[in-house]
Amino acid sequence: MRGLYLITNDDPIQLLLEKLDVALATGQIAILQYRRKKIAKIDQPSEVEQIKALCEKHQVPFVINDDLALAEQFGLGVHLGQSDGEISHAAARLPKGVIIGRTCLNSLELAKKAIADGATYVAFGAVYATSTKPEAGNVGIEVIKQAKQKFAVPICAIGGLTVENSQVVIEAGASLCAVISDILGRSTAEIPARVTAWATLFD
């Protein structure tokens, strides 16, 4: 599990689907996460169904942010924040073998617990300041270096990551770089080249 971890943005769904299709078609997206905080709960299942079809078409693992019930409805993996319930509970409700990730902020102790509970990967951030979560602060790369030395599961970095600033993050030990705006903040035409630029960082 290594490479670009793409997270959805708040574009209108048709535009988002177009962007996701060209991004996933590159064959260089490691995981896609559904995160649509501004979309009403009642509208989310139909969006997930459409995006799930794209992920199946391009053979990209698909996970749901925060919402275990939604993940369970579609038999998908889930990414859980610290306040989104226990990993063991998620593992009991989801199909065997799906991805279960955990936000660990800047804490190796939280990561240790998550891994003991069965997390597939652990995420640290925000590495850099970010408009998506301005309250998250920036943890820098030292915690990623330490996590890489301590843990066998993939380390995911998140927060303000771009092609230009992420080489050091990957060299520090991040197997996954979670990104929203550096891909989906661009036009559909620009996305494939940007995804490819990311992929070269992981070579």
Q: What is each of the regions a protein language model found here?
A:
Residues 47-66, 88-107, 137-163, 198-203:
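Alpha-helix-loop-beta-strand connector modules within alpha/beta enzyme cores
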